[in-house]
Design a protein with these regions (language model features):
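Solvent-exposed alpha-helices and their adjacent loops that cap or buttress functional pockets
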Residues: 34-37, 94-97, 156-161
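Glycine/small-residue-rich phosphate/adenosyl-binding loop
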Residues: 44-118
Length: 193
């Protein structure tokens, strides 16, 4: 399960069955949380049509920021600017990699471990999705876009008092991997007190 998991950046152009999404969420909500707070919110885009509207809105906003010279500095601005150009000139979706669905985890800022809980929940979702043949990718470009357009979180229904965890695009993979990635040995530090 762990060794076979791969990031998927190409998806089939169709929605997953709603029952499958429900099953993935139902299992994922059992992920461990600090002090058993169980306060992780899963914000989900369940339909490709909604993803298309979200992407169009974000690309429009990012293009406006780019035109006004207000994209973030450094690599973040470079990646976001490239996402705008790729969509406008080539129809290439770097923001969501063509995935029909998106999940964002968040938790109340006053929860005992809001960041850790959201990342554990999203990792659980990823592994359960992989076990069901669903492809996923941690969506850092979307997180950059969300930071550049913070009001979008509210439009997605994420409460103001929540700490954002991370986002993951997902859907039916349009690519099949026949072997795992060969990785080096684990980095281990053995403590000798």
């Amino acid at each position: 399960l762990i060794k076979g998991r791969r990031s998927v950046r190409r998806y089939r152009d169709r929605d997953l069955a709603p029952e499958l999404i429900d099953e993935l969420l139902e299992i994922s909500c059992h992920a461990p949380t600090g002090v058993n707070s169980r306060s992780v919110l899963f914000t989900v885009v369940r339909e490709r049509a909604v993803m298309n509207r979200l992407r169009d809105h974000l690309i429009s906003r990012l293009a406006q920021l780019q035109d006004e010279g207000r994209l973030p500095e450094g690599l973040t601005g470079k990646y976001l600017g490239r996402a705008v150009i790729a969509w406008q000139q080539e129809g290439k979706d770097i923001l969501f990699r063509g995935a029909p669905h998106l999940i964002i985890t968040s938790a109340p800022a006053d929860a005992p471990c809001p960041v850790q809980d959201t990342l554990i929940a999203l990792t659980t979702f990823q592994l359960i999705a992989h076990a069901h043949g669903v492809g996923t990718v941690w969506d850092g470009i979307f997180m950059m876009a969300l930071a550049a357009c913070p009001d979008v979180a509210g439009r997605l229904g994420i409460p103001e008092n929540h700490t954002l965890g991370y986002a993951m695009a997902f859907g039916e993979p349009a690519v099949e991997y026949h072997r795992t990635v060969q990785r080096g040995p684990a980095l281990v530090n053995v403590v000798k007190w």
